[in-house]
Amino acid sequence: EEGGVTLRRLLREARRGKFKPKDILRDSVLIYKRYLEQNKLMFAFIVGERSGGSPVIRKAIRLEEEHFVHEMAQDLRDLGTVPGLSSQTLELICSLVVTTMLNAANDILDLPTDQKQSEQELVDHFVAQLRLIFLGARLWREP
């Protein structure tokens, strides 16, 4: 929980204007990557337990994911990033983002520290995945 609070605060700052709007995705990915690298043991535990751990731990991890989703949805609503979408749809979009972030954690944690090219390719790929989510969100029409 403690690590989640810090990471959510860092990412919230990125979304709320500390960075240029066009750089928010890349800056958020870099913040996330740096945070994972600084907290490898915790995230290795989270990634492993998220799908194979005890039910109590999985529930705690899901609760943190829900906090991320709700906060991000509120920020997107406040920023008008994807106008005209319901709260339910915003939370669906944010759920895709959080799932993508957590799925990328293993790849980030497995990166050798001396392979800058691989690191750049991974960051670029992760940014492209998030960009695709938001491009789709902008085109989404409520049923």
What are these regions (language model features)?
Residues A137-P143:
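C-terminal effector-binding regulatory domain of bacterial HTH transcription factors
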Residues N39, F43-A44, M72:
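Short, structured loop/turn "capping" segments at alpha-beta junctions
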Residues E2-R9, Y35, P55-T81, E91-N106, ...:
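Amphipathic alpha-helical packing segments from all-alpha helical-bundle domains
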